[in-house]
């Protein structure tokens, strides 16, 4: 729900550049078609939106992580907020690094003037893994019972399985190009996927 409300179809962009999905050449999806052909123009609104929408998620996540302790509430609620924020920050960076390569990596909102130098792909992936393997993300439940985490029979908040599935995707990406970490990371991906399958 957070993903769709904040990024709409933007997370599909890395898939359009691969073999998972393609666009209909007869459709009016020019924005997607340019990305599908690896030929987006400078004015491509989808690319601009993808960048700004995902950095908006990162900025919100950083704000929560930095300021949750100042909120007058119980420890369980604070930890839950940080859990969710770390996952969404990792998820946003994972989408961005696959699309753009080297990107600015910010873990605070102190430098908001857009002058940060890009971090390397490897540095970005290291932070993604750090967030997804943090104590907070490791402690997420398999399901929720009460609103707002659980609405209309659906887990709305991030679950343990969502983290494991995302880690599997991250390790798969790290195993191949451009990092080329190889067999060990394919095994990590398989191990995480097995956790999801086995519940």
Role assignments for model-derived ranges:
Residues 1:
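Mature N-terminal segment immediately following signal peptide/propeptide cleavage
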Residues 4-37, 65, 98-104, 125-149, ...:
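Aromatic-residue-lined binding/catalytic grooves and analogous aromatic/hydrophobic interfacial grooves
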Residues 25-100, 114-126, 132-150:
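Conserved, well-structured interaction surfaces
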Residues 70-76, 105-106, 180-183:
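Short coil/turn and helix-start
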Residues 107-111:
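Outer-membrane beta-barrel translocator domains and adjoining extracellular loop/strand segments
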């Amino acid at each position: 729900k957070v993903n769709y409300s904040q990024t709409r179809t933007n997370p599909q962009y890395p898939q359009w550049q691969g073999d998972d999905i393609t666009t209909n050449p007869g459709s009016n999806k020019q924005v997607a078609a340019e990305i599908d052909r690896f030929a987006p123009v400078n004015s491509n609104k989808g690319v601009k939106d993808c960048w700004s929408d995902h950095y908006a998620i990162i900025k919100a996540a950083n704000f929560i992580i930095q300021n949750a302790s100042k909120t007058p509430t119980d420890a369980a609620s604070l930890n839950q907020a940080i859990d969710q924020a770390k996952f969404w920050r990792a998820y946003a960076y994972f989408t961005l690094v696959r699309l753009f390569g080297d990107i600015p990596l910010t873990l605070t909102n102190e430098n908001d003037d857009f002058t940060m130098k890009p971090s390397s792909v490897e540095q970005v992936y290291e932070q993604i893994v750090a967030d997804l393997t943090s104590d907070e993300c490791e402690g997420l439940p398999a399901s929720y019972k009460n609103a707002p985490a659980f609405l209309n029979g659906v887990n709305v908040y991030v679950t343990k399985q969502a983290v494991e599935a995302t880690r599997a995707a991250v390790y798969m990406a790290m195993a191949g190009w451009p990092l080329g970490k190889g067999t060990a990371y394919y095994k990590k991906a398989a191990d995480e996927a097995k956790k999801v399958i086995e519940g």
